[in-house]
Amino acid sequence: GGSRETIPLGTAYPPGTYTVQLVDADRVVAAVEQSIQPDIVIRELQLGRNNPEDMFEDAGNFTITSEVIVTVENVGTGPERLIELQFTGDVPRPTPDELSGSGIMAVNRPVRYTELNVGPGETHTLYSGTSPFGPNSDVVSCTPEGTSGQFTVGLEGNVAHGVVEQEYNVTYQGEDLTDCQITIERANE
């Protein structure tokens, strides 16, 4: 008879191919190779201002108008710890180079956390914490005829040591950013 052993992996492992061996009395009787690699995909991006019902409970008006809802999925075979959410390009408030914190406001009532573990096959919703669509900007403006641009959302993980990026097209239409109709769509679709 054999026994089954589960070993928690955590998020401090080097991704790659591992060999799992079945050992009986110091003799390897079977071996299986397994690739353990996270693969984070940005499934959906929503503006809080356009989807207030999807914001977390007790989100204030400023948070609703300036933050973003991001749905991510790990389609890989190993866990990932998301450590930074970045916005670059034509957004009112791009993520500063020297960001203090992660830019992530993941809410799991009653606890809020700023880094997020995503296991293989898991889907999670997180919220931005840097007000990328806040009402003040030196980068973009809202005009009655509409202003178009493009921005990139990046998620950095500490296991894969890379940034997953997704580009979006954006249009700002209205009198000012406080009362602006902002539409986004995934680029390259």
Question: Where are the regions that the model predicts?
Answer:
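Acidic, polar-rich N-terminal leader regions of halophilic archaeal proteins
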Residues: G1-E189
